[in-house]
C-alpha cells in the first residue's frame, strides 16, 4: 500500500468497477477504492457496473451506497459482457478524468497516485497499466503476446499489456473517438486504444502490481476469442 501523504492528487475523478457475480470481493474492493479516493480527489464518484449478477453483488453495493452517496450502481438487466460494462462506465462518468479497475482484487487501487503523477509529468491523455509480473498461466501470457503483436502489425499500436484492467483516461478521449462497439470479451480494450491512437491521443504506460484473479472471465472462452479476432479484422478494414 502506498503512502497517502506522498500521493499525487487530482481535482476530480470518476472511477468505475465492472462487476459480474463478485459478491466475495466487491465489498472489500469498493471500500479500498473509496478510502483511496477520499485522500486523492477533491471531487469523486465511484460507480459499480453490475453486469446482470445473479449473486448478492447488487445488494452489497446498495448497502454501501446507503453509507456514502459518492458510490453509485449501474445495473444491467442481463449479463451483457465486459465490453458493455466498460462502455456503461465510460459514457456515464461525469468528471474530466476517468479510472477503472477490475473488481475481483487483481489490483491495488492505491497505485492510482502513480497514474496521476505520470499523467502530470507527460501530459498524456491515457495512462495504461502494464503488469510487473502477471499472475496467470503461461498459455494466457503467450496468447496475449500473440494478440498484441497482431494489433501492432495491423494498427501500429505498441503497448505492453493491452488488456490490463487498470487505466486512467481523459474524458475528452471518450467524447472524441468513434463510438465503441464491442460488448463481450476483452476486445473492447484493443478497440478503445486503437481508436484513441488513431484519433491522435497520447498514450503512456506505467507498471502495476498484479494479484491472481479469483475466477476466469468470459474473455478467455474459445468462441469469444475467435470473435475477437474477427472483430479485429473488421476494425482494420474500417480504419
PLM ranges: what are they?
Residues 76-92, 97, 109-186, 211-230, ...:
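Acceptor/aglycone-binding surface of glycosyltransferases and processive sugar-polymer synthases
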